[in-house]
Amino acid sequence: MAYPFQLGLQDATSPIMEELLHFHDHTLMIVFLISSLVLYIISLMLTTKLTHTSTMDAQEVETVWTILPAIILVLIALPSLRILYMMDEINNPSLTVKTMGHQWYWSYEYTDYEDLNFDSYMIPTQELKPGELRLLEVDNRVVLPMEMTVRMLISSEDVLHSWAVPSLGLKTDAIPGRLNQTTLMAMRPGLYYGQCSEICGSNHSFMPIVLEMVPLSYFETWSALMV
């Protein structure tokens, strides 16, 4: 869950988000070391009185600053590619949910059930109850079982949208005429908030997403009541 004046990423709830956080820290450390080295060299160049005017080239230095950046890029690319392949893998999902973006709300369909579908609209500010979050609460939450692989099929009825839930490491474009897919798995129960992350018109900011992750027994009870 995000909080005011937050500077870092949200706490990870899924294995993919855990991997993304580790990759972020890994890459940030490399960038920090490179920046420190460059600033150190610049400070030396600005403060030293020594000059080396007789040397026109230095092959050893050129070799180092050619090979070293290549090694650094490999160290960044390999874990990045690993995570990309992990995000694309969809192995035997336990549940499939289709979501469609509209101006300006989301609709959901549980394809494993005959008649389980609903629209999800933002609750206006004047109708919020004490403790509820402005611009993030919806009238119908997406209830899903925790610790199970869920496949999301995402598309749009009108313009470009983007279905994003940061704490699960999810962000998939909803494109008219195209069906994109992604998977999610929450490791603990709770409410997880997201929003449309693609400018889609005047009410773009009023398309929240709320996932309610519950144990399987609670999900089965909820789905039986909804059907």
UniProtKB/Swiss-Prot annotation:
Catalytic activity from the UniProt record: 4 Fe(II)-[cytochrome c] + O2 + 8 H(+)(in) = 4 Fe(III)-[cytochrome c] + 2 H2O + 4 H(+)(out)
Residues the entry annotates as binding Mg(2+): E198
GO cellular component: mitochondrial inner membrane; respiratory chain complex IV
EC number per UniProt: 7.1.1.9
Keyword Magnesium: yes
A biological process term (GO) from this entry: ATP synthesis coupled electron transport
InterPro entries: CcO_II, CcO_II-like_C, CcO_II_C, Copper_CuA, Cupredoxin, Cyt_c_oxidase_su2, Cyt_c_oxidase_su2_TM_dom, Cyt_c_oxidase_su2_TM_sf
Signal peptide limits: none
GO molecular function annotations of the record: copper ion binding; cytochrome-c oxidase activity
Binding site for Cu cation A1: H161, C196, C200, M207
PTM-bearing positions, type Phosphotyrosine: Y218
Residues spanning the membrane: 15-45, 60-87
Residues bound to Cu cation A2: C196, E198, C200, H204
Cofactor: Cu cation
Keywords of the record: Copper, Electron transport, Magnesium, Membrane, Metal-binding, Mitochondrion, Mitochondrion inner membrane, Phosphoprotein, Respiratory chain, Translocase, Transmembrane, Transmembrane helix, Transport
Stretches of the chain forming a coiled coil according to its record: none
Cofactor annotation comment: Binds a dinuclear copper A center per subunit.
Pfam family, one: COX2_TM
Membrane side Mitochondrial intermembrane: residue ranges: 1-14, 88-227
Family annotation (NCBIfam families): CoxB
Assembly and interaction partners: Component of the cytochrome c oxidase (complex IV, CIV), a multisubunit enzyme composed of 14 subunits. The complex is composed of a catalytic core of 3 subunits MT-CO1, MT-CO2 and MT-CO3, encoded in the mitochondrial DNA, and 11 supernumerary subunits COX4I, COX5A, COX5B, COX6A, COX6B, COX6C, COX7A, COX7B, COX7C, COX8 and NDUFA4, which are encoded in the nuclear genome.
PANTHER family, per database record: CYTOCHROME C OXIDASE SUBUNIT 2, CYTOCHROME C OXIDASE, SUBUNIT II
Entry function: Component of the cytochrome c oxidase, the last enzyme in the mitochondrial electron transport chain which drives oxidative phosphorylation. The respiratory chain contains 3 multisubunit complexes succinate dehydrogenase (complex II, CII), ubiquinol-cytochrome c oxidoreductase (cytochrome b-c1 complex, complex III, CIII) and cytochrome c oxidase (complex IV, CIV), that cooperate to transfer electrons derived from NADH and succinate to molecular oxygen, creating an electrochemical gradient over the inner membrane that drives transmembrane transport and the ATP synthase.
Family per similarity comment: Belongs to the cytochrome c oxidase subunit 2 family.
Entry protein name: Cytochrome c oxidase subunit 2
